[in-house]
């Protein structure tokens, strides 16, 4: 079943001085419970596409649908997670996680239980009453992930959520996200500049062309799950997809990315 449909979407940013075409005729379908990563050069419109899916922007032309319904505004069944955790410093961990419950006026008792379960799932049991300044960057992002999941959305949109972290923490959280996705089974769209992150996490990788962004290539990652990192986790399939992705992103002629083609 299709969770997200992007139909002929183009988007232009307009100012008094200029018009910037960010996206051009995007066509994309993402299946229910599928994990999709978006990769491409800086400025190709990855984050813009994510914001269109979230209902934070309206496309200039075209249509975005989630669950068969047009996205015209932010929806409660869609969560968006950013590069920075944006935790409220005066709130405790559990209070930060519960914020969407308050905003959406959901049942506090039932969702308090879910919040505690998510904190346990992400290794934060015992930190419920700590404040953000008492946590490491990786722990803060775990709290942000719990907050994004607490109201049980069907779709999770993630805009480079681990990019500001050190390499070791980033790898740890990538593996943890894969495990959580395996348990929660959400539809996830994940923006990244990391080839390793894209191949490790994705069922499919959407490679976007330079601006104006188009879907230049769709790569299917056929490696078994759960996936691991390191020498002992060598996977010919991940190596193959990573090499193809590297070739696409670092091609001498960027115009190669401008012509969409099917999976190889």
Where is each model-derived feature located?
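Conserved signature/switch motifs of ABC ATPase nucleotide-binding domains
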Residues: 130-133, 151
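Catalytic Walker B motif of ABC-type/P-loop ATPase nucleotide-binding domains
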Residues: 156-159
């Amino acid at each position: 079943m299709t969770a997200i449909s992007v139909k002929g979407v183009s988007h232009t940013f307009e100012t008094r001085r200029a018009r910037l075409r960010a996206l051009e005729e995007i066509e994309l379908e993402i299946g229910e419970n599928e994990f999709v990563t978006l990769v491409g050069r800086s400025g190709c419109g990855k984050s813009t596409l994510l914001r269109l899916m979230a209902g934070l922007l309206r496309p200039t032309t075209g249509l975005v649908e989630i669950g068969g319904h047009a996205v015209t505004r932010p929806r409660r069944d869609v969560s968006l997670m950013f590069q920075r955790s944006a935790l409220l410093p005066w709130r405790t961990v559990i209070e930060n996680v519960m914020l969407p419950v308050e905003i959406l006026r959901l049942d506090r008792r039932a969702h308090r239980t879910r919040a505690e379960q998510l904190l346990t799932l992400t290794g934060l049991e015992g930190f419920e009453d700590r404040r953000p300044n008492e946590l490491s960057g990786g722990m803060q992002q775990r709290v942000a992930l719990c907050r994004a999941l607490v109201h049980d959305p069907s779709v999770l949109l993630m805009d480079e959520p681990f990019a500001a972290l050190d390499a070791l923490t980033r790898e740890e959280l990538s593996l943890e996200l894969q495990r959580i996705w395996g348990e929660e089974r959400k539809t996830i769209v994940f923006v990244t500049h990391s080839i390793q992150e894209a191949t490790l996490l994705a069922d499919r990788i959407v490679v976007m062309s330079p601006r104006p962004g188009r879907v230049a290539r769709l790569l299917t990652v056929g490696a078994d799950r759960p996936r691991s990192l390191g020498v002992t986790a060598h996977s010919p399939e991940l190596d193959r997809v990573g090499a193809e992705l590297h070739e696409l992103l670092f091609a001498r002629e960027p115009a190669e990315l401008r012509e969409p083609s099917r999976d190889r």
